[in-house]
């Protein structure tokens, strides 16, 4: 499948949402979410996702094959476990494994699981919507495109690999399609699966921890190019 060379990101949120809707309309779409990558980028940029709203949007706009959420978890984190249970109730398929704790780090990379599923399920979908800015998935995208699949990357601006951005057929900034995942609320009470109350408190499983390193929403990151590699806190 040839890339859509004429695609240009619209200037406003409504146009960008409409463009994504037009791309996936009535198509067989598989949505894969790299939770660790999504968590880190959205926590730093203070984007809070209503996952229930996002699932409902995709289910209405396309022939949704599945929405698969890849994450490592801490079985002792009550709030994280409740969050994951709510995701499952909302229709998400969880692919998860417990984190591994070492003397100076916590590890829980799910890249291999995501890539294997994307390949094993290739006959079931026409479009793959990947929620991740991780450049490690560039090779996966190249392989799927050779097999005729259309790849959409949805990630946070400034936290996306340049190679991943360039390889995908279409790229959408998460903060430019907010009507998909954010429902206006009259109160601060969450109705459904809202990352504002739960996700920012969950430790990203792929972040290396030591006594000198602490990643918070106030972390200042170096700015080089408008689209740059994700800071190297995610480990293989």
What residue spans do the PLM features occupy?
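Nuclease catalytic cores that cleave nucleic-acid phosphodiester bonds
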Residues: 75-210, 214, 233-235
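General structural signal for secondary-structure boundaries
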Residues: 50, 175-178, 227
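Domain-level signal for Mg2+-assisted phosphodiester chemistry and nucleotide/NA-binding surfaces
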Residues: 2-110, 150
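Low-complexity, prion-like intrinsically disordered regions of RNA granule-associated mRNA regulation factors
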Residues: 2-19, 195-236
